[in-house]
Amino acid sequence: MTPTRRVVTGIVDGIDVLESDGPAPNSLDIGPVAVSEVWWSERGHRTVGDPCDRTTPGFPLEPPPGGASARIIRMPGIPDGADLDSTWLRVDGDDPSTPGMHATDTLDFMVVLDGSVVLGLDDGERVIGPGEYVVQRGTRHRWRPADEHGWTYFVAMLRPDPTVSPVDGSVRVHSTGDAPVRRVITGAPVLDGAAEVHLANGGFTMTDMWHTGGPLRRAAQGGDPDGPWALEPTAGGAWFRQWTLEPAPPSDAGWHRTRTIDLDIVLRGRVRLDLPGGITTDAGPGDVIVQRGTDHRWTALGDETLVVATVMFDAVW
């Protein structure tokens, strides 16, 4: 797999800049499996200027307590004549009686970019297709390809920190709604259906997949937002969302700045990112933009609706 293109913005000496634009440096090919690590965080108390890349060797499965990782992973399809039970992705320490079945002490935000995958849970299997979301809350699970074609997915893994103080972050129990986006939320019971919270404003929509409600103390923590809609996460929290934008001329009203680290993954369409001073870059499907507290605006290009998955982490300046 070609290493994932990653665009990183930042603030240098008070000026909004495009810090880098190129392949994610921590990339790994293991036979037919390819991994690009697009972001890594060692701690829960984040600043917008924190480094994006891990400097330690190896590819640890889980980040440290309070930390988070984000990766794009490419998996092969089912080989000709293969027994399906042999195609489950094996993980060190998984259940030998149920190949690939494992649990991590993480809250995982996952979206399929292309292809299809089977998610195996204790209550059965579900096929997850392109543009569909999974919120994996520390439960037992496993993965295998759905067909002979490969599949690519993005996953952000958030590691709880049991020492943080609980915060009332205005979240409520998640439920099925009528937003035109499918999400699967693991737990007891599993929720599989349309997302509930969906904001539409002209040519822009925002669909909420998950809010942690504050610093992450447990992998199962969070739910749907409760109360007035807000752009930024609760202090110390993280949000998982999808937003769409219809093609239109650039607008001065589109400029904005948030006190967050945003991981934006283009699922469909093309987008132009503008920063002050005439800095601009275009991005397309599979590209990742790490947006770190800069003033910026988005413009959808061409004639196709822009669809972007985003993970927003609260941060300080």
Residue ranges, per PLM feature:
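Glycine- and acidic-residue-biased ligand/ion/polar-headgroup-sensing regions
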Residues: 97-99, 105-122, 259-276
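Conserved short histidine dyad/triad with adjacent acidic residue
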Residues: 53-56, 68-104, 138-140, 160, ...
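N-terminal leader/capping segments at the start of a protein or of a new domain
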Residues: 1-51, 171-220
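A short hydrophobic beta-strand segment most commonly corresponding to one strand
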Residues: 108, 133-142, 148-166, 262, ...
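Residue-level signal for well-ordered, solvent-exposed loop/turn and beta-edge residues enriched
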Residues: 15, 116, 193-194, 270, ...
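Extended, compositionally biased flexible segments
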Residues: 30-66, 73-76, 206-236, 241-244
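Short acidic-glycine-tyrosine-enriched beta hairpin
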Residues: 122-138, 277-293
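Structural motif
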Residues: 116, 140-142, 270, 295-297
